[in-house]
Amino acid sequence: MIRPLLVQTMIAGVLFVLTATAYAETVNSNADLANSKKTVAYIYSRPMVDALYRLAIEQDKKFGLQQNCKSQYGVEPYSIVVLQPIDFPDNKQHPIKGIWNFRYQIHRCGESKFYNALFIASGTGETPPTPRAYFPGTSNASPLLIKDTMVAALVRASSQSGLKDCKEIDVFDMRVTEDAHDVTEEGKTHRGVWNETWTFRLCGKMFDVPITFIPDATGGGTSFVIHSAKSTEAAAKP
């Protein structure tokens, strides 16, 4: 397996840090990562990157991507989001608590794709965290917001595609189409509004669902508006 130089360099540093440190860390949010060298080293360690590689292979197979590709896969870490606090005791080889999302880009045969993986701590610290494939792409929405939005987006894609009876439905991609900006309507300004497009594969056909996310000015959450679904020209691979 061939990895980009960035990943190779990270792993070299990680191996040293992991063998040289033996102290406890608690990472409550992304803001704590800058001062949590042990945890960061663990997250970017070879076993974690290898898990990303295996998940990417599974995801490519699921989506029918690059099945005839003979080149090696490159795994490029992109970002980490701490979803639940990570507890890493000094006497454990693995964290005992915590969930984090690892966004990464896979490179193969001249093409690349963003995938996401959720890592869930085992609870004992005796075994590695469990990696689970999450929705692909680069959405800025939190997992909770994605969950709240998903049903409405699926209904829109299904109803407007004419494939209401389709049972083979996958989220193929999520991407930001317009970064956070201010929107003024009827004299009221909404700040931090952003737009995304979610691509669904329904029975071998692709449909884009544009979504507008509107953060509440008082911090009460984020609302969303689902726009009309559009068929894409590129057909999904079986």
Describe every region a protein language model picked out:
Residues A20-A24:
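Sec/Tat signal peptide C-region and signal peptidase I cleavage site
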Residues M1-M10:
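Bacterial N-terminal signal peptides that target proteins for export
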Residues T9-L18:
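Bacterial N-terminal signal peptides
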Residues E25-P238:
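Cysteine-centric segments in proteins
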